[in-house]
């Protein structure tokens, strides 16, 4: 049984749970027993003996040895007490070495007191053990107190249990360092106890090993488990001694309980190993170092064992009493120190008791929880077992059904095998008969083929001659093509020449007429040449047509051959399809895997039969191929003859068609002559038109010349400097130019018409040439057709003779083809039977291969599971890499957030700079225009916008990367789903393999875990997307705020520009108004001074000053000066008003700066609020993730349960599908049986044919009978011919012997027929038996007749001798 089987796994889980529960109970029972023991110890406590300072070093050494030998096993502890009991009597030598300063009276009193205490404690513990054994079986083994040290397995030896409290006090000194180990005693004790239980079960199987281990364990000092120190008064000095006694009693009880099961098995081994144990004990006593208390305990044990040792000890005690008194005094000194240590230990014990109470409460809660969990697990276990039981019953039912179907299929297969054997026998007999017939037919075919081969040789020679003629014709065609190319070149040269002539035709009309005459002559010569060329072309075309027709005939013959080949291929395909059907049927018949071993044997026999059949078939195939080749030769001969006939028929048809074509050609010639006449008339008309156009062209040229002269005159007139005539002649010039343009247009149209007419002339000349050539070719064709008509008479006689020969050959070929088809059908039947056998063998081989493949699949499934595990590991690595990438992306996002913050800081700095610049602008409005500063601000803002666009691009790239990662996750999910499907398929295939089911479930769990990880990654991606969207929103808000700030800046800039423009315009207007006023005033003041208004104001003022000074020199007055002072005051007031307006504009700019600062502050406050909200949302997301994870765990648990149910359903469906397959196979077998029956009917038909042949042979025998009767009559009538008959007797005997052989053959065939028809109907068998009986009777009758004839002959001879 494997570990991962379901039944073993179900049993193991509850057993582990039960052991854990018993461990918890054991710990609690231990604590309760410890309290009871403490109460008993308080009653009987006494002061222990003192210790010496010299023995402390020895105790430390013993502690080290005990620490080395702390992990003693329970199986060894069971065997060690016997060793001590056997060797107690012999330990006096070691006892005398250690000094024992005690009197005999003290020793005896101590022994009595201890015996009484041990009896009381044993009685109390026996009662307690009986109670616990009734409550639970395991509590009796777990009565030990909770230890403080790290050694949880106490030894069960009585010698180690009787150690005195001197050693324990020394251990209590180190109790401060070991309080940490008290908190978890139960946890450290559980694995050791489990190990002890496993070892106790295997004690019976490991006796020899335990005996060897005991030798080693005796050499090492045993460790006494330390116990809790009770709360006792300082006056109770003997409490430690009583505690040891209680521990000894407990250990004895535990030993009694543990040894009750194994005493019987160990008595035999202890007797065998007694001597070895004694030696080991002596060696151990020599090596050990005892304290006084330990030595006293050993002596008491030895006293109990033997009385002789008591006398020896009394003598030794008298001698050493003085030394003991000194030691007692030293020990009393040590008691004071020990009491102080005991007080410290009491305080520690109080603390430990409080901790114990807290641990008890904790353990109570844990036990309650464990009980609830165990109850739930038991319920689930029960439901699971019920489900498994139901599924197991269903599977058993399905197996029973499957076995029944298998048995049915085996019975059917056996029946089919019997039928196959019968069919094989019938096939073998039929093949023998067919081979004999085929041999005779082949001889006939060979003779016919020899004749046909001779005829083929003659026709091949004729074909070679025809090919030579064709080659000559092809050479002539090539020459004609060359001539055509040369004619085309000449034609192109003529076209070029005509174009040149048309160009010269425009220059002079008289030369044109002469040239036209010359051209006509040339055209006639060319036309004659072209007609010659056309005639040669037509001849070549006729030859080409003949060649093409011959090639078409050949192509038709090849097509017919291809059609026949295709038909044969189709027949082969049909046969292959039938063979494939038979293959599938035979494979379905032999699908049972149970027959694999039997079929191997059958395959070997059938392989031998197949080899024989294949050899025979190979011979038949060779014969058939030779026959097919001969047939092909005959068919080629036929085709060649038919082609010749077709040629002759074609010639006759061509001759008939040529007569019709002659008539058509004559008609077409008349039509073309009419066309030529019409074209010549059109040419003449067009020539007249060209002459007229040329005359008009000359007239227009003359008019142009006159107009040009007039234009020159007008230009001369224009050159004259008379203005009134210029205006009058303008109209005339315009009219003249219009006329000139109209005439130029007319000239152009006339030229175009002339060119079109020349082109038409050239085209019509070409058409004339073509028509002339066609006429000449038609005339030549007429001549050739007349020649062919004269040759027709000679061809017709040849055609008739050839047709007769062809009809004869066709009859022969048809007979040969029929014979071949019959043979092909026979061979096809044989091939079918052979292929059926090969299919059976292949099916058997396939079944064996399938059985092997199934065995290999079972091995491959384990490898697939391993591969899936490796794939899952790879997927885990991919998931880890994805997580690392996500972490990197998160880091990048954080970095980008920091960059955004930095950019926001830069934006704040820029806004502050903008404010500073605005302030500077307000200060420098009078000096520098505001437009340049606004442009700087716009450039900076544009730079910031570019940075923001870059950030947008970076964010979009990151979003794309995240989208790609999401796609990768989706692909991972799809792969995981595919892995799920593969795992489910593996489950369905491995329903029978319980060992691999556990592994597949583990793989599903791993896949589910990976899906969880993927889901968590998707959630993280969604969170990151949300974070990205939030950051986008933030960025959008910041952009909107920046845009608002930009809009505010733009509005302020526009306002400032408008105001500056307004102020500038107003200033200019004011300045202009002031300048105008000043001029007017100055002119009013000095009316006699006048200056031009186009001069600038400054020049005007300078000039006016000069003029005014000159004027003032002449006339001076004080009143004018006063008026000027008043005007200056008014100008100063205007200047003050302008300054006030500038201050107002500055205040407006300051207000806009304040608005921008407020916007920045609001933006920063909103950013802080958003950050707080983001942190709160992240906390909420973490909480939601934790809750979602818990819900996902529950959902996955439910999914696993659902998957288990689905697996059971799938198993059921799989079994149902197997049943359906079995039913389908059964139906296929039935159909195959029907087909085999059809084959049997066909074979019966063939046998009937053979039976008809036998009847025919019987008729021949009857004819022979008639002949014999005629011979007898002749013998009776013609006695004179007896001498001749006597000479012909040996020949007649030979003929009779041959007849008897033939009759024997017929009888053998009849027997074969009877043997082959084992499975036929009863009527056929009766008929054939009657035929055989009749044949035998006829043969007997013939023999009697022969005997009578011989007797008559002998009598005739005797009579002849007597006559002589």
UniProtKB/Swiss-Prot annotation:
Keyword Nucleus found: no
Residue stretches in coiled coil: 315-1085, 1116-1306
Chain intervals with Basic and acidic residues compositional bias: 46-56, 73-86, 121-135, 170-179
Molecular function GO terms recorded: kinesin binding
Cytoplasmic side: 1-6
Main location class: endoplasmic reticulum
Pfam families linked to this entry: Rib_recp_KP_reg
Region named Disordered: 46-207
GO BP annotations, alphabetical order: microtubule-based movement; protein transport
Protein modification: Both the membrane and cytoplasmic forms seem to be myristoylated.
Superkingdom, natural source: Eukaryota
Transmembrane segments: 7-29
InterPro entries given in the database record: Kinectin, Rib_rcpt_KP
Sugar attachment sites: 202, 267, 623, 638, 704, 775, 976, 1061, 1088, 1094
Mode of membrane association: Single-pass type II membrane protein
Chain ranges on the Lumenal side, renumbered to this chain: 30-1364
GO CC list: endoplasmic reticulum membrane
Subcellular location: Endoplasmic reticulum membrane
Chain's role: Receptor for kinesin thus involved in kinesin-driven vesicle motility.
Assembly behavior: Parallel homodimers formed between the membrane-bound and the cytosolic form, and also between 2 cytosolic forms.
Misc remark: A cytoplasmic form lacking the first 232 amino acids has been characterized.
Similarity comment text for this entry: Belongs to the kinectin family.
Database matches in PANTHER family: KINECTIN (PTHR18864:SF1)
Protein name per Swiss-Prot or TrEMBL: Kinectin
Record organism: Gallus gallus
Gene coding for it: KTN1
């Amino acid at each position: 049984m494997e570990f991962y089987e379901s039944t073993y796994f179900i049993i193991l889980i509850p057993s582990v749970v039960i052991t854990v529960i018993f461990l918890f109970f054991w710990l609690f029972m231990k604590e309760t027993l410890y309290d009871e023991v403490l109460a008993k110890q308080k009653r009987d406590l006494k002061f222990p003996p003192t210790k010496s300072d010299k023995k402390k070093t020895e105790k430390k050494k013993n502690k080290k040895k005990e620490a080395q030998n702390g992990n003693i096993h329970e199986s060894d502890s069971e065997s060690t007490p016997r060793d001590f009991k056997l060797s107690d009597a012999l330990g006096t030598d070691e006892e005398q070495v250690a000094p024992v300063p005690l009197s005999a009276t003290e020793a005896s009193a101590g022994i009595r007191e201890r015996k009484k205490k041990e009896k009381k404690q044993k009685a109390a513990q026996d009662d307690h053990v009986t109670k616990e054994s009734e409550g639970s079986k395991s509590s009796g083994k777990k009565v030990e107190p909770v230890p403080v040290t790290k050694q949880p397995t106490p030894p069960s030896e009585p010698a180690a249990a009787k150690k005195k409290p001197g050693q324990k006090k020394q251990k209590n000194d180190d109790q401060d360092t070991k309080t940490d180990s008290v908190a978890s005693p139960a946890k450290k004790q559980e694995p050791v106890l489990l190990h002890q239980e496993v070892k106790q079960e295997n004690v019976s199987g490991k006796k020899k090993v335990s005996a060897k281990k005991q030798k080693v364990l005796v050499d090492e000092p045993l460790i006494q488990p330390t116990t809790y120190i009770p709360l006792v008064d300082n006056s109770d000095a003997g409490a430690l001694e009583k505690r040891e006694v209680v521990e000894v009693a407990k250990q004895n009880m535990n030993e009694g309980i543990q040894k009750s099961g194994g005493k019987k098995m160990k008595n035999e081994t202890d007797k065998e190993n007694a001597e070895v144990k004694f030696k080991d004990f002596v060696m151990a006593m020599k090596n050990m170092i005892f304290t006084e208390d330990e030595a006293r305990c050993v002596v008491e044990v030895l006293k109990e064992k033997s009385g002789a040792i008591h006398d020896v000890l009394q003598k030794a005690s008298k001698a050493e009493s003085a030394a003991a008194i000194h030691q007692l005094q030293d020990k009393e000194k040590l008691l004071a120190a020990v009491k102080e240590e005991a007080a410290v230990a009491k305080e520690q014990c109080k603390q430990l008791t409080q901790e114990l109470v807290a641990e008890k409460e904790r353990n109570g809660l844990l036990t309650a929880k464990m009980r609830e969990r165990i109850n739930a697990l038991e319920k689930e276990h029960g439901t699971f077992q019920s489900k498994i039981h139901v599924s197991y019953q269903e599977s058993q039912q399905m197996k029973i059904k499957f076995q029944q179907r298998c048995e049915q299929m085996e019975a059917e297969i056996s029946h089919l095998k019997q039928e196959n054997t019968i069919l094989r026998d019938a096939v073998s007999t039929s093949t023998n008969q067919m081979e004999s017939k085929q041999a005779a037919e082949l001889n006939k075919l060979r003779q016919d083929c020899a004749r046909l081969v001779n005829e083929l040789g003659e026709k091949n020679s004729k074909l070679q001659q025809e090919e030579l003629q064709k080659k000559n014709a092809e050479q002539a065609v090539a020459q004609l093509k060359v001539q055509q190319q040369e004619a085309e070149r000449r034609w192109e040269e003529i076209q070029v020449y005509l174009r040149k002539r048309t160009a010269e035709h425009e220059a002079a009309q008289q030369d044109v007429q002469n040239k036209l005459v010359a051209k006509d002559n040339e055209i006639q010569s060319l036309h004659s040449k072209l007609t010659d060329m056309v005639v040669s072309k037509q001849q070549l075309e006729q030859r080409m047509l003949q060649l093409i027709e011959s090639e078409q005939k050949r192509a038709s013959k090849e097509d017919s051959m291809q059609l026949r080949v295709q038909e044969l291929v189709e027949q082969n395909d049909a046969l292959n399809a039938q063979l494939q059907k038979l293959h599938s049927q035979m494979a379905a018949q032999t699908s049972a895997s149970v027959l694999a071993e039997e079929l191997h044997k059958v395959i070997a026999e059938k392989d031998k039969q197949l080899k024989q059949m294949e050899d025979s078939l190979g011979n038949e195939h060779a014969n058939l191929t030779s026959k097919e080749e001969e047939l092909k030769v005959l068919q080629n001969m036929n085709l060649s003859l038919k082609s010749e006939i077709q040629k002759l028929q074609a010639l006759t048809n061509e001759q008939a068609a040529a007569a019709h074509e002659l008539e058509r050609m004559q008609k077409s010639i008349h039509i073309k002559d009419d066309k030529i006449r019409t074209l010549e008339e059109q040419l003449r008309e067009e020539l007249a038109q060209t002459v007229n156009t040329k005359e008009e062209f000359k007239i227009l040229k003359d008019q142009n010349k006159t107009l040009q002269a007039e234009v020159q005159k007008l230009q001369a007139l224009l050159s004259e400097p008379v203005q009134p005539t210029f205006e009058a002649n303008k109209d005339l010039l315009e009219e003249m130019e219009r006329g000139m343009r109209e005439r130029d247009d007319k000239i152009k149209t006339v030229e175009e018409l002339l060119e079109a007419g020349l082109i038409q002339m050239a085209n019509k000349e070409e058409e004339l040439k073509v028509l002339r050539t066609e006429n000449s070719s038609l005339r030549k064709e007429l001549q050739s057709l007349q020649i062919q008509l004269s040759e027709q008479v000679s061809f017709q006689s040849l055609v008739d003779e050839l047709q007769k020969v062809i009809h004869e050959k066709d009859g022969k070929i048809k007979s040969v083809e029929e014979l071949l088809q019959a043979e092909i059908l026979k061979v096809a039947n044989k091939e079918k039977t052979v292929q059926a056998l090969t299919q059976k063998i292949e099916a058997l081989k396939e079944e064996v291969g399938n059985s092997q493949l199934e065995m290999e699949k079972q091995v491959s499934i384990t490898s697939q599971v391993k591969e899936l595990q490796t794939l899952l590991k790879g997927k885990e690595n991919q998931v880890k890499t994805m997580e690392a990438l996500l972490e990197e992306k998160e880091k990048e996002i954080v970095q980008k957030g920091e960059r955004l913050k930095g950019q926001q800081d830069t934006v704040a700095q820029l806004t502050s700079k903008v404010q500073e610049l605005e302030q500077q602008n307000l200060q420098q409005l009078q000096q520098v225009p505001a437009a340049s500063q606004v442009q700087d601000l716009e450039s900076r803002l544009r730079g910031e916008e570019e940075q923001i666009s870059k950030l947008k691009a970076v964010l979009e790239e990151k979003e794309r990367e995240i989208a790609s990662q999401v796609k990768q996750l989706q692909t991972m999910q799809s792969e995981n789903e595919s892995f799920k499907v593969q795992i489910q398929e593996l489950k369905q295939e491995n329903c029978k393999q319980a060992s691999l089911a556990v592994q597949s479930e583990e793989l599903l769990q791993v896949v589910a875990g990976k899906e969880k990880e993927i889901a968590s990654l998707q959630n993280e991606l969604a969170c990151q997307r949300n974070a990205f969207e939030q950051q986008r929103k933030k960025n959008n808000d910041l952009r909107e705020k920046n845009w608002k700030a930009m809009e505010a800046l733009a509005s302020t800039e526009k306002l400032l520009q408008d105001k500056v423009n307004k102020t500038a315009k107003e200033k200019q207007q004011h300045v202009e108004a002031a300048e105008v006023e000043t001029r007017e005033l100055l002119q009013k003041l000095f009316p006699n001074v006048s200056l031009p208004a186009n001069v600038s104001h400054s020049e005007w003022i300078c000039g006016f000053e000069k003029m005014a000074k000159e004027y003032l020199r002449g006339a001076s007055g004080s009143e004018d000066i006063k008026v000027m002072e008043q005007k200056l005051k008014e100008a100063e007031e205007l200047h003050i008003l302008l300054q006030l307006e500038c201050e107002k504009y500055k205040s407006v700019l300051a207000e806009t700066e304040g608005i921008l600062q407020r916007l920045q502050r609001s933006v920063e406050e909103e950013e802080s609020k958003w950050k707080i909200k983001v942190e709160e949302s992240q906390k909420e997301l973490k909480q939601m993730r934790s809750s979602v994870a818990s819900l996902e765990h529950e959902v996955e648990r439910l999914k696993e349960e659902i998957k288990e149910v689905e697996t059971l359903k799938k198993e059921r469906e799989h079994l149902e599908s197997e049943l359906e397959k079995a039913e389908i196979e059964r139906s296929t077998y039935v159909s195959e049986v029907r087909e085999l029956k059809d084959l049997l009917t066909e074979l019966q038909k063939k046998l009937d044919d053979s039976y008809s042949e036998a009847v025919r042979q019987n008729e021949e025998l009857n004819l022979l009978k008639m002949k014999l009767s005629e011979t007898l009559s002749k013998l009776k009538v013609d006695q004179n011919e007896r001498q001749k008959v006597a000479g012909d007797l040996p020949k007649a005997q030979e003929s009779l012997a041959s007849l008897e052989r033939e009759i024997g053959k017929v009888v053998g065939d009849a027997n074969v027929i009877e043997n082959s028809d084992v499975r036929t109907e009863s009527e056929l068998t009766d008929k054939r038996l009657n035929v055989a009986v009749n044949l035998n009777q006829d043969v007997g009758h013939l023999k009697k007749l022969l005997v009578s004839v011989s007797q008559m002959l002998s009598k005739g001879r005797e009579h002849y001798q007597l006559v002589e």
